[in-house]
Amino acid sequence: MIVAVIPARGGSKRIPRKNIKEFCGKPMIAWSIEAAKASGCFDRIVVSTDDEEIAEVARSWGAWVPFMRPRELSDDYTGTLPVIRNAVDWINQNDSQVKYACCLYATAPFVSPEDLQRGYSLLKQESASFAFSVTNYAFPIQRAIRITESGRVAMFNPQHFNSRSQDLEEAWHDAGQFYWGTKEAWLKEQTLFNERAVAVKLPRHRVQDIDTHEDWVRAEWMFRAMKSKE
């Protein structure tokens, strides 16, 4: 069985009810559910939540919510791995054996069905443990600066002060959208970022952090602009 697991707890602090707040005409989580359905990759689209209202909204958009997430996995400090591990364990014990699982964030409206398909293909082709979305930094991280306690400026890597941008290695970061993995990887690995993982590259304009009200407004502008060109 191939499953998508969408983590969506109810206790978001900076943007209350973030996972079901309306984003460009739909509850935020609906965009992830619809992308998963349109990809054709999944036998089940599961939402892991501790919140009855989120569960109801998720079901209304076609997701499966067969259990409520335990309280101990629903606080501000629980990471992605134990949440997906819990869902995979539950499905293995109560439904069918999972072969591949994809963690798809509820707050990833920019994810496309094609992105999910590419991730699945890469996972299998490369015999990888994980395949997850990344995008590149807009500026060379080797030339990053910090502000000291006295308010002065210092480079993290002073040896690159005179380096040309085109001579520096390109750096990438987690795009925070989706993470494909084998059942074994989800159940046994301690980190997603290891030598057994492969990257699914996304363009920067489709990678938007949505953590504040300003982020939300900017993301809606970008989303509408992107959709108007399709």
Q: Which residues are covered by each model-predicted region?
A:
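Short, structured coil segments at secondary-structure junctions
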Residues: 41, 61-63, 149
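Short aromatic-hydrophobic micro-motifs that form the base-stacking/packing surface
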Residues: 102-104
